[in-house]
Amino acid sequence: MRFTLISLVAAFAAIAPFSAAQALDEVTVALAIPPAVHDGAPYAAAQELGFFKQENLEVKTIVFQGAGALLPQVASKRVTFGYPTSEPVISSYFNGKDTLPLRYFYNGVPTNTMEFAVLADSPIKTIADLKGKQIGVGALTWGTIPGGRAALRTAGLTPGKDVEYVAVGALASGFQALKSGRIDALNFNSSWDDMLEMSGTKIRRIAYPEVFSETAGNGFITHTDNFRDHPDLLVRFARAYTKAQIACQTNPKYCVQAFWRANPQAKPAGTDPDRALADATTLLSRRLDRVLNKADGTPRTPGRYDLKAIQAGIQAMADAGEYPSADVPVNNIFSNDLISQINDFDAEAVRQQARSAK
């Protein structure tokens, strides 16, 4: 399965509206950022190992420029699922208009992976030190920006006054902006910062305040109608995805190679192939460890939302002035209703299949 970045205009032409004739088999997943090996490998593994086929699914992915561009596509049923961060959806409850008819059904990133990163020799060592600086993000439509602004406010900074967000593009273009001094810091996820370090650039990471650590990150979201009309489709897709994550945790080297086979342009060129494979394997393993295990190393229930932690994170966002209040119907936004069905499979059989995959 190849990932393609296309314009909104092309997306409108390429994606048929969600319909009953397609719903049982064809799934289009809208992503907010281009996939890299750490988050794209499970899709490739699900394809190669037959997990999508076992669930009678044909899965396609499309990349939009941030959650702000992605969410309207899910709300209008132009795509089946989206994989955005949660802040824009929560924010929609405060805009004085009708809330988006969307609901999350699978927690893809149950721990906050966002952070600030500066060059290792930078004098910036704390969030407060970012005063008067420029922070790079992929696009100003990114759904992660509200969380970053809240982190800045907890340190006494006012975004737009004391510190400025600058669009620098994703991955390599953002890395270059930091290395060249165009910006002072990046506000990327930890896996992207891992990639920057592995490329030879020494950085210093600055974590968000602890209260934001277990807030919901990216997850699979769909139109609320699909909970009523097509719950089995949601279960089958998420089950295949979960199998792929477990397979990649078991055999990350295979999953890296599967991702490169599906996306040859993503394979590093001009570098030692063994080193590139080792680095990518480490990157994927780190990501899956954060997603599938808690901080103490115990396993999470794949896809499950910690609603109490999410509510605490919303309260922290409200306290920081990012939300006008914490009065949000968390249960209407995040659902655990399908999690037991999603995880109803033989995980050890998946691991055995993964161990022999090449």
Tell me the role of every PLM-derived stretch.
Residues L24-S180, D184-S190, I206-E214:
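Short, glycine-/small- and polar/acidic-enriched structural segments
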Residues K60-T61, E164-V166, P273-L283, V328-N343:
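Short linear loop/turn motifs
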Residues S122, A172-P273:
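Pocket-lining segment of extracytoplasmic ligand-binding domains
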Residues L307-K358:
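Conserved C-terminal helix/tail region of periplasmic/extracytoplasmic solute-binding proteins
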Residues R2-A20:
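Gram-negative bacterial Sec-dependent N-terminal signal peptides
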Residues E55, P101-L102, V256-A258, A326-D327:
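Short, hydrophobic secondary-structure boundary micro-motifs
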Residues A44, I90, R149, D194, ...:
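Predominant activation on well-ordered alpha-helical scaffold segments within soluble catalytic domains
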